[in-house]
A protein has these predicted regions:
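A cross-family "folded-core" feature that marks the main globular domain of proteins
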Residues: 1-186
């Protein structure tokens, strides 16, 4: 896409990509999202969203996750927090091409403060924003490390997992019986 001078994010999404985006949207929040809001976010009709949600529910949800529907309120996914995080991680891991990983590692190891990495399946979600914040923080941590000993696959896993954990913790979604401590208690 760079050779053709076309940003791959400008191309309309097919059903598979729309379903990934819908999953990410629904998994990063605890609130219901209306069909119209999802349609506007993906630039498709509400009927397309309804069809995609049916396919998502029948073919893409892991056992233990449930797509909930409520008239005039919207849609949301419920299930065990571990499954929610694993599903998000799986979507993000499968999205990266070899070129994306190369570009991401270059950005992580010697990128500038204003450089930005776009995640196609997480566009316009909290994951996109947090992912780039984590890149900047990790870059500062890696400044003093011996880069020859780094395992890029592990770096990518850490980057994705810290992003997911941060987004989910901001929504007060913890694994097990852990509880968030209020800042006043610290």
């Amino acid at each position: 896409s760079e050779l053709m001078d076309v940003n791959r994010f400008e191309i309309f999404a097919d059903q598979s990509l729309r379903i990934k985006r819908l999953l990410i949207m629904l998994l990063v929040t605890k609130e219901a999202i209306t069909g119209m809001k999802m349609a506007n976010a993906l630039d498709v009709s509400k009927d397309t969203i309804m069809n995609d949600l049916d396919v998502l529910e029948n073919n893409f949800l892991k056992e233990g996750l449930t797509l909930n529907r409520q008239a005039r309120k919207g849609f949301w996914i419920t299930g065990e927090e571990r499954l929610v995080r694993l599903t998000i991680e799986e979507i993000l891991q499968k999205e990266f091409t070899d070129y994306d990983i190369y570009k991401l590692m270059s950005l992580l190891l010697n990128g500038g403060e204003t450089e930005y990495f776009e995640m196609y399946s997480a566009t316009a979600t909290p994951i996109q924003e947090v992912f780039n914040q984590v890149i900047i923080r990790m870059r500062h941590l890696l400044e003093f490390e011996n880069l020859e000993k780094l395992n890029y696959a592990e770096l990518l896993n850490i980057l994705i997992r810290v992003t997911i954990a941060t987004v989910r913790l901001r929504k007060e979604a913890t694994i097990g019986r852990y509880q968030l401590v209020a800042e006043q208690e610290l």
